[in-house]
Structure formats: C-alpha cells, structure tokens
Curated annotation (Swiss-Prot):
Catalytic activity reported: D-xylose(out) + ATP + H2O = D-xylose(in) + ADP + phosphate + H(+)
Enzyme class: translocase
UniProt-listed Enzyme Commission number(s): 7.5.2.10
Binding residue positions for ATP: 38-45
The protein's name in its UniProt record: Xylose import ATP-binding protein XylG
Quaternary structure and interacting proteins, as annotated: The complex is composed of two ATP-binding proteins (XylG), two transmembrane proteins (XylH) and a solute-binding protein (XylF).
Residue ranges of domain ABC transporter in the record: 6-245, 262-507
Record keywords: ATP-binding, Cell inner membrane, Cell membrane, Membrane, Nucleotide-binding, Repeat, Sugar transport, Translocase, Transport
InterPro entries reported in the protein's UniProt record: AAA+_ATPase, ABC_carbohydrate_import_ATPase, ABC_transporter-like_ATP-bd, ABC_transptr_XylG, P-loop_NTPase
Role of this protein: Part of the ABC transporter complex XylFGH involved in xylose import. Responsible for energy coupling to the transport system.
Membrane topology (UniProt): Peripheral membrane protein
Organism: Burkholderia thailandensis (strain ATCC 700388 / DSM 13276 / CCUG 48851 / CIP 106301 / E264)
Family: Belongs to the ABC transporter superfamily. Xylose importer (TC 3.A.1.2.4) family.
GO cellular component terms given for this protein: plasma membrane
Length: 519
C-alpha cells in the first residue's frame, strides 16, 4: 500500500466554546478518492476549511501531515502552494471575466513590466481543458455564458492549473443535470488514474458509491468510521451518518384531499434578458386542499419561473390569473402572496431565502414581524418564544437563536427557511427543490413535515429534479417541458420513465399525428 499523501489526526475546532470538530481523523493516499459523509452540521465543511487553510494553523488543535511532513498553513495560499485545492459548493468564479482569466485568477502569467500575458493564458487554458477532454468551452468567452455543469469543469481546470495533488470537491453536483453529473464523475475517475487524490463530499450516496475507494463518516463533529467502499452499503452509510436506521424515507399515510384551493390560469413569463422568448407559455393548473402536487421536468423547463410568477417573485414580465378558493387575487409581490395565504421556499435559499447578516431567529420571524409589534415596538419575548418553538419543531441546529444564519449548514438553513414560511400559516406551500444539498436525515424530517401538513389540509406544490422524490411524495404529478404542460398524472403506479418521456415532449410534437393514429 502506498504511503499516505495526507494524514489528519485528532483535529479539534471550537467556535465560541462549542466543539464543531472533536478528534477527527482522515487519511488520503495518492490517486485515492475518499468520500466524506455526514449529516448537515456534522463538521464536514469545517474539517475541509481546516485542511485548506481557511482556518489557519493555530486556530485548531491536532496534527496534519502532508507528504510525510507537518503542514503549517497560515492561509489558503499556503495550502494551494502545497497542492491542496478546494472547490466550494458556491463556485468562486467571476462571471464577467473570460474562462481563461478565471482559470488564472490570482496566478496570472505576466510579461516584463507586469502586464498580463493573455495569449499565454489562453494557450494554457486550452491545454488544461484538453487534458480534461473538454472541447465545448471557448476560453475567450465570459464564464456567465456557461451553465453550472461547465462552470464546475472550469473550476476543476483552475485547480489543476494550481498543480493540485489533492482536490476537495464540496457537493460538486448540487446544481448539475444527470448528464453533467456523469461527466463530472468520469473526470474524477480520470484524475484518480493520473494520481490526483480527491475528497468527495456529497449527500448523493450513489455518486459516493460510483467514484470513492474509501468512505469516512463523521457525526456531531466526531469520527465514526473509515471503511472501504466495497464493504459498505447505502443503508450502512446512512445508519452511520444519522446514528439510526431510516427504514421508510417516504412515510406516506392516507390523507383527505378536498376542494381546489389554488388555481393558476394562463401563466406566461417572458425571459428577463430576451423579452420575446417565453420561459413559461400559457400554463394552467390547480391544487386541492390536502393534496401534494409534484412538479417535474428537465432543468430549464420553466418550473421555477412558474412558481415565482404565482408567488409574485418573477423578476421579468409575466401575466397570470390566480384564484384562491375561487376568488381572484392581485399578486404583485411576495408580500401580497403571503397575505393571501401562499408561502414559498425558494430554489436558491442563499439568494432568495435568507438574509445572511441576520441571526437565525430574525430570519425566521422576518415575514411575520407585525405579529409581534405593538405601537411600533417589537415584543422581544413573544418573538423569542415563536423562534424557539419553530426551531424545535423542525430541529434547526444552532448554538443560540441569534447566531448568524450564514454560519449554519445548508440543511439547517433550509429548515430555518421552512420554519419562516410555516409561521405565515399558509393555505398553500410551494417547495422549490426543498432537499437540494440536504443530508438524508434532514430529508426524512422534511418529508415527514410535508405529509403532516397535507394531513392538516395544507395544499403543497413540490418542485424537484429528483424523480424518486416526486414519486415518493406526490399525489399527482405535473410535468413541465419548455415552458409548457407536458403531462398531468395521478401518482398511481406512475414511473420515472413515464415522467421523463412526458418531459421530453413539446406541445407541437404531441399535436402531430402518430403512425398509429394515422392508420
């Protein structure tokens, strides 16, 4: 067996007296991919921040050995010079700069006199992308011209330009399509063959199984186990992550479905940058009291834009007729929607769901502050009671209610956003990608909440790119393709293949006579 490239022993990290890491061990060998698994808040990101120099030497206890020698890093620059490079879940690219400029950001090739040698950077950027077998990216174009999948590959090229020996990938596929994810996994396999080591952090255990040689599981800041992937099952990894076995991820129980509560008619949304293009084209649907409506479709199909239009949050021009309990609504903003009894947990919680500078508690009560106001003053005690009750209800983990929400894990941020929306007492709750970047334990909690709300008579609209999630939750499935309704199915024996087949159809294609109908 080859000597370890990296050895971390007994890593301890405190935040204001709260132990985020409590004696964590991690070993990585050249050309090995180690899966780092744990629930949200388990300490995965904190451990990687220690390793990558975000938390410099001296701010934590323990030992790190790199290539057989102690690693003493005062910052990210030191670890990158050593060959340790992290690619964060939120990509660190400058949209307005070219691909080549992003790849060399902070490591520019310069001419005598200090001017950038742009031609040399373009040549080297081409070489790096060729090494990754990528030919669909023009290095002279701005990064903003490319989607999430290509941007992830640009980040990997940027890491290789820093001569990475160990690549840390933090939730690398959270915003990728299935095809883009497969391409990413192929590149990870290729990097392993070239001797580059990887630490792969993902809640998608099928990806961990596909590329990882070893799995290290941590829970509540402690090391649980390190085992070869071949000796593990998905069920065993989950049990180690959460400390218990999750037998039924979708605890479906009978619930009564009542009358139509929300009806959307002829929803049309125009593209923000190209108003002649329609992102949503004349879509109509309804949802009943106590019903869980799943909304499926390919990435870019217009699902999010449709939900934003109903919630009064679409940034471009749109037209729609929205009725609540048979009465027309005039929704011009999210505040109008909330007053009408419609709440929404957005797809991008960091941009649209939280105020990062505020504490967890103040984020939770942001939509209902008037409830605690008397003569212009907030009843702080009543507000705190509501915050604590909400956090307890959804098991939001935070050292104290007014810790900045930006410091929470993704899963706890998501549960805080859910808590905020539930405080509005909605009749209709829209959940757009509710479990993106969320661990399996938090997923199970969110699913239990969805079914509990349905039993209480709340109408739920769940938008998800995970077809297993749609089929596990929904009573009925609406399929959107190219901004149009491609199918509306009762979830009784419905399959993923049927949903995908519907998503790939356009209205024009459906209108054409088939060979069977022509005979």
């Amino acid at each position: 067996m080859t000597e370890p490239l990296l050895t971390m022993r007994g890593i301890v990290k405190d935040f204001d007296g709260v132990k985020a890491l409590d004696g964590i061990d991690l070993t990585v060998r050249p050309g090995e991919c180690v899966g780092l698994c744990g629930e949200n808040g388990a300490g995965k990101s904190t451990l990687m921040k220690v390793l990558s120099g975000v938390h410099p030497h001296g701010t934590w206890d323990g030992e790190i050995h790199w290539e057989g020698a102690p690693l003493v890093a005062s910052g990210v620059r030191d670890t990158e010079r050593a060959g340790i490079v992290i690619i964060h879940q939120e990509l660190m690219l400058v949209p307005e700069l070219s691909v080549a400029e992003n790849i060399f950001l902070g490591n520019e090739i310069t001419l005598p006199g200090g001017r950038m040698h742009y031609a040399a950077m373009v040549r080297r950027a081409h070489e790096l992308l060729r090494e990754l077998r990528i030919d669909a990216i023009n290095v002279a174009r701005p990064v903003m011209d490319y989607g999430g999948g290509h941007q992830q590959l640009i980040e990997i090229a940027k890491a290789l330009n820093k001569r990475a020996k160990l690549l840390i990938l933090d939730e690398p596929s959270s915003s990728l399509t299935a095809a883009e994810t497969q391409g990413l996994l192929d590149i990870v396999r290729d990097l392993k063959r070239r001797g580059v080591a990887c630490v792969y952090i993902s809640h998608k255990l099928e990806e961990v199984e596909a590329v990882c040689d070893t799995v290290t599981v941590i829970r509540d800041g402690r090391h649980v186990a390190t085992e070869p992937m071949r000796a593990l099952s998905t069920e065993r990894i989950i049990a180690m992550m959460v400390g218990r076995e999750i037998r039924n991820l979708y605890p479906r129980e009978p619930h009564e479905i009542g009358d139509v509560v929300l009806e959307a008619r002829n929803v049309t949304c125009h593209d923000v940058t190209n108003p002649r293009r329609k992102r949503v084209d004349d879509v109509s649907f309804s949802v009943r009291r106590g019903e869980i409506l799943g909304v499926a479709g390919l990435v870019g199909a217009g699902r999010t834009e449709l939900m934003q239009a109903i919630f009064g949050a679409y940034p471009g021009a749109c037209a729609a007729s929205v009725l609540m309990n048979g009465r027309p609504l005039a929704i011009r903003s999210p505040a109008d929607a909330i007053r009408a009894g419609i709440a929404m947990v957005p797809e991008d919680r960091k941009r649209h769901g939280i105020v990062p500078q505020l504490g967890v508690g103040h984020n939770i009560t942001l939509s209902v502050l008037q409830r605690f106001a008397t003569r212009g003053r907030i009843d702080a005690a009543a507000e705190l009671d509501a915050i604590r009750a909400g956090m307890q209800r959804l098991s939001v983990r935070a050292a104290h209610p007014f810790l900045p929400i930006a410091g929470l894990s993704g899963g706890n941020q998501q549960k805080a956003v859910l808590t905020k929306m539930l405080l509005t007492d909605p009749q209709v709750l829209i959940l757009d990608e509710p479990t993106r970047g969320v661990d399996v334990g938090a997923k199970a909690e969110i699913y239990r909440l969805v079914f509990a709300l349905a039993r209480r008579g709340v109408a739920l609209v769940v938008v998800s790119s995970e077809l297993a999630e749609v089929l596990g939750l929904a009573d009925r499935v609406l399929v959107i393709g190219e901004g149009e309704v491609c199918g509306d199915f009762v979830n009784d024996g419905l399959t993923q293949e049927q949903i995908l087949a519907a998503a790939l159809k356009s209205r024009r294609r459906r209108a054409e006579p088939t060979a069977a109908s022509a005979t």
